[in-house]
Amino acid sequence: IKKILKDKKKIMIFLDSNHTEQHVLAELEKYSKFVKAGSYIIVFDTMMEDMKRHHFKARPWDHGNNPRTAVWKFLKKNKRFKIDKEIQKKLLITSCPDGYLKCIKN
């Protein structure tokens, strides 16, 4: 991945696989190092934090353990990224609230 992306000026990474906090946090930590200032990581299905507890039956993720809680933990440690609320405002409806992460410095 590093070799493929080394000469790219803008990079957009989409995270939408396993939705547990632990998994998404690991993805954010791994892939964030490839993202340059002005580029984005989009974390999907952060709306899970807004759902009722036990809404997702037979799934390991739930309220309190999901992509949005991973984003919040990631941003506490990584000051290179911020939530871009402007995208969320333009879309009005999204499955990714707080999931549009803009890289603000290299």
Feature locations, PLM:
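S-adenosyl-L-methionine
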Residues: 1-7
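A short SAM/SAH-binding and catalytic strip from SAM-dependent methyltransferases
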Residues: 11-21
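C-terminal substrate-binding/active-site "lid" region of AdoMet-derived donor-dependent transferases
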Residues: 21-105
